[in-house]
Amino acid sequence: MATQLEQLKKEFLEYIEIEKGRALKTVENYDRYISRYFEFSKVKNPSDITAESVRTFRLWLNRQSLGNNKATGKTMSRKTQNYYMIALRVFLKYLTRRKVTSMAADEIDLAKVPERHLDLISPSDLARLLKASPGDDIKSLRDRAILELLFSTGLRVSELCSLTKDVDFTSGEFSIRGKGGKIRVVFISEEARDTLKKYLKLRKDMSEALFVQIGSQKKNDMDMKPLTRRSVERIVKQCAIKAGISKKVTPHVIRHCFATDLLSNGADIRSVQMMLGHANIATTQIYTHVTDAHLREVHKKFHRKKE
């Protein structure tokens, strides 16, 4: 029989999925984070959640070794530890909303994390990457369309995988449902639009997904499977290797390139925030460190050169 706390957790997860419109992946993560705290602290009732039990749990998380080789000494990052605390805070806020007596959410502080480091590739590497799948067969066109679409829209890989064939690309813009169910408009380049048109012209299957698995499919298979996040990540990685790029390249690296390209060329940060789908402008401001460095170089090169 489920404890009172387990029942409240179940209702909380249903609440954030239905009322708050959180993605299923987010709901699953919250379930895992909160359950891990319950198991470690052996709490049964809301009143059992205390500052001391949370502190002990945080200490335990901080000492957890990662991977199979504990000898490496690599432990859980503060950022990952914060995910557990954020989930617990949101759950406690829900309990307060339900007038259930428990620990106050604001008693949980988040750990300070090191300043985020952006993984970027140079403009010349990016140009080679976009040309890494030059053929006119369906697989080459699909891979090229993925690269062009990622760079011209700044889509997250999960957003890219959710696209269907009925998206109207002819206008050069379309709406996408992003994190938290929020809808935003993204814009596509002529290169992306042209490549997508050629790719879709060769599609003979009945799948609704925009991007599908091709290599392992039979020629007469009319129901091709949609690409997964892992599949897209693998395609981007393979194209980067073909382009001779030594750095690790992921769909998110291309998203970073999209943002820095806009800011470096004069776009205002609010517009970039909207195009990326960031809820908080502070998330977008990490890109200004890169563009500030670019502007410093411009200033150094051109300022007061007549003297």
Which ranges hold each PLM region?
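Conserved catalytic core of the tyrosine transesterase superfamily
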Residues: 1-307
